[in-house]
Curated annotation (Swiss-Prot):
One of its GO terms (molecular function) is GTP binding. This is Adenylosuccinate synthetase. Binds 1 Mg(2+) ion per subunit. GTP binds at residues 12-18, 40-42, 304, 330-332, 412-414. It catalyses: IMP + L-aspartate + GTP = N(6)-(1,2-dicarboxyethyl)-AMP + GDP + phosphate + 2 H(+). Signal peptide: none annotated. One of its GO terms (biological process) is IMP metabolic process. Pathway: Purine metabolism; AMP biosynthesis via de novo pathway; AMP from IMP: step 1/2. Belongs to the adenylosuccinate synthetase family. SMART domains: Adenylsucc_synt (SM00788).
Length: 446
């Protein structure tokens, strides 16, 4: 048995959906532990594309239980749309379970999110406008609506009448927006409640039972380390904790139940929305990476900002998450690049540093210190073993493993499941502590 957390090691959009889908073959349970419809993951199977925002990637495996944990925030309308889409595609959803403790995104959350972002003007955070932040804010203020509240028809009516009237004051007085009709909201969410009722469960207990039965559990994060509310590039972050520690809080399991942590990172770096980005490319190369990598958000369709791989961020992700290994995605996007740069340190106010600054103002003054490596100038998409790779592509991967100080277990070379190189078993392979001595890699190092 192995219980594994999969996290994003950059600013999200790293390809966690594909990696989770691959690992789900060995998992008995897949659990989503934070975030909401602000995150999207795409899985491609036999030329069929599945775009999901809330439902875990493991849903494509009929014998794998899928759980939406208590740390998520759920937009019922979007969740039902995903259920309907999967039903039409012939994918069973009978093995999906929704935590009764998860909070619910309401219409006023979306309205406040969009109006608040607009009011920020030049100080926009880059929110998706899907109501995620306000939903988490209500959770912290203890005024939120949970899934279990929707399951109690009479209690829901009473709670929603009070809450909607309270939010109407904010909508009208603060944002000059039209008020919501409490009865219309109640009627809408009663329909959602009836549809979701068969899926609702005490998911913390369900996960613990799976653990007691020695089943393999895979915890699936959304977004990425640098978007973490506590450890990311604040204030340009999400409202939850995508880091590995969030898996425990967002599902109701203890930290001793986690065996391994796998980080996912692109062979380059992308970011959506506002905030500092030291390796961002504003030239033709940045445009080329965006176009070759189809770097447009699953949720918003926004163009992603593109730049070179940042090893400072990589090392930070290793430290914050306790990564055991790394999955590197989209290596094939670099196939036609003449020279590839990797940021190995920052120059900050005249001083060089290899450590990530948590101060956003200081981070905005960071300039990348690059090491330049030769490109391989040939296709990698059909490679299935390390030996199949062009020597310079293998050298690039070895350098990343060495500079980030964690072994690479998976290399992704395309969107399809089989466009992948499995370097070592990411679930049952050696722990990072056994692979490193004095910071030097003994696997895939230069």
């Amino acid at each position: 048995m192995a219980n594994v957390v999969v996290i994003g090691a950059q600013w999200g959009d790293e390809g966690k959906g594909k990696i989770t889908d691959l690992l789900s073959r060995s998992a008995d349970v897949v659990v989503r532990y934070q975030g909401g419809v602000n995150a999207g993951h795409t899985v491609v199977v036999n030329d069929q594309t599945f775009k999901l925002h809330l439902i875990p990637s493991g849903i494509l495996y009929p014998n794998t239980d899928c759980i939406i944990g208590s740390g998520t925030v759920i937009d019922p309308k979007v969740l039902i749309e995903e259920l309907d889409m999967l039903d039409k595609l012939g994918v069973s959803t009978s093995h999906l379970f929704i935590s009764e403790s998860a909070h619910v995104t309401m219409p006023y959350h979306r309205m406040i999110d969009q109006a608040s972002e607009e009011r920020r003007g030049d100080h926009k955070i880059g929110t998706t406008g899907r109501g995620i932040g306000p939903t988490y804010a209500d959770k912290s203020e203890r005024t939120g609506i949970r899934i279990l509240d929707l399951m109690d028809p009479e209690g829901m009516k009473k709670q929603l009448r009070w809450t909607v009237n309270y939010k109407n004051v904010i909508l009208e007085k603060l944002y000059n927006l039209p008020h919501l009709d409490p009865e219309e909201v109640i009627a809408e969410y009663q329909v959602y409640a009836d549809r979701l009722r068969p899926f609702v469960a005490d998911c913390s207990l369900k996960i613990y039972d799976a653990y007691q039965q020695h089943r393999n559990i895979l915890f699936e994060g959304a977004q990425g380390t640098l978007l973490d509310l506590d450890h990311g590039t604040y204030p340009y972050v999400t409202s939850s904790n995508p880091v590995a520690g969030g898996a425990c809080v967002g599902t109701g399991v203890g930290p001793t139940m986690i065996d391994r942590v796998i980080g996912v990172a692109k062979a380059y770096t992308t970011r959506v929305g506002e905030g500092p980005f030291p390796t961002e490319l504003h030239d033709e190369m940045g445009v080329a990476l965006c176009e070759r990598g189809a770097e447009f958000g699953t949720t918003t369709g926004r163009r992603r900002r593109c730049g070179w791989f940042d090893a400072v961020i990589g090392r930070y992700a290793v430290r914050i998450n306790g990564l055991d290994c790394l999955a590197v995605t989209k290596l094939d996007i670099l196939d036609e690049v003449d020279e590839i740069k990797v940021c190995v340190a920052y120059e900050i106010d005249g001083h060089e540093s290899k450590d990530f600054p948590t101060n956003a103002r200081q981070f905005s003054r960071c300039n990348p210190v690059y090491k330049t490596l030769p490109g391989w100038k040939q296709s990698t998409i059909h490679c299935r073993t390390l030996e199949d790779l062009p020597p310079k592509a293998l050298d690039y991967l070895k350098f990343l493993a060495s500079i980030v100080e964690v072994p690479i277990a998976i290399v992704s070379l395309g969107a399809e499941r089989d466009e992948t190189i499995i370097v070592e078993d990411p679930i049952h392979g050696p722990k990072r502590a056994l692979l490193y001595s004095n910071g030097e890699s003994q696997a895939m190092s230069a």
